Amino acid sequence: VGRESTPPARLDDAVVMSLTPDRVDVVLRSKVDAAWHLHELTRDLDVSAFVMFSSMAGLVGSSGQANYAAANSFLDALAAHRRAHGLPAISLGWGLWDQASAMTGGLDAADLARLGREGVLALSTAEALELFDTAMIVDEPFLAPARIDLTALRAHAVAVPPMFST
């Protein structure tokens, strides 16, 4: 085994008060259980990389996606845990991609315009692949490959998260 990566995520968007344990579990299981099992199965193997696809939602939150944000935060923490134990790991907190997918298929033009006004810009596939290649040579447990318009983010945020300040 040379490299390991986690399976795709599941979504079940809702406001926090309407999330049931079952709804949270479905979303957590797709990322948390899969990543933890891969961690356990590979921690004694000589793998060259352990790559997890997280989301900016774990870093900055996302309206209606508390369960998804929690699942992604777990991946980010698992990468730090593995690195603290001398194991390879990186969690990539991806921003928005412009290519339609199961994750973005429900976004319409109005949603994309709102995200843009809030500072979240879509990555082209070429940009995302270039950022992925770069991430594979950077020695960090977590990176956030994303296009962010800091001016727009500052204009719509009560406080800019420290990660995005100068």
Which ranges hold each PLM region?
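4′-phosphopantetheine-dependent carrier domains
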Residues: 1-166
